[in-house]
Amino acid sequence: MIITNPNPPTSLTANTITTTSIKFSWVAPSIVGGSPVIDYAVYWDQGVASWTFRQNVTVNSYTSSGLSTGTTYSYYVLARNAFGYSLASSAGSWLAATAPSTPAPPVTTISGSNVIISWSPAPSANGSPITSYQIAIM
């Protein structure tokens, strides 16, 4: 049997993002080179264009903690078998932030067949810009 490097992991996906942590997962390589994957090497970039080894893990997920709110972090993963490491996965990049706080209750004005709804912006965006508001009419 010939053993070769595994294929890289795929589909890095953020599972949980907070102001100080990001949990992400990936799909294990479908071609493992004739030897099971032993572990995964996680690398990250803290927004300074310099990739750094973070940790080896034996499962296909990782939680990066101690992050700074409002900073974008990028990660890639390598799979390792008995022969060696795969090429790097495609990178995943996420912003350490949570949902913004709720804006003040809206003011509603009804005039004939028109309804005008207005509100003040949320007092805190928690490190991420507010890009839209959703209005539900019940």
Residue locations for each model-derived region?
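Pro/Thr/Ser/Gly-rich low-complexity, intrinsically disordered linker/stalk tracts
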Residues: M1-S35, T69, F83-P129
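Accessory recognition modules or surfaces
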Residues: W44-D45, V57
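Solvent-exposed strand-loop boundary residues in beta-sheet-rich modules
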Residues: Q46-S50, F83
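Short beta-strand elements bearing conserved aromatic residues within extracellular beta-rich modules
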Residues: D39-V42, S132-I135
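Short beta-strand segments within Ig-like beta-sandwich modules, predominantly Fibronectin type-III
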Residues: T52-V59
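Beta-strand-rich modules
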Residues: S64-S86
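Disordered, low-complexity "stalk" and linker segments at domain junctions of extracellular
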Residues: L78, S113, S120, Y133-I137
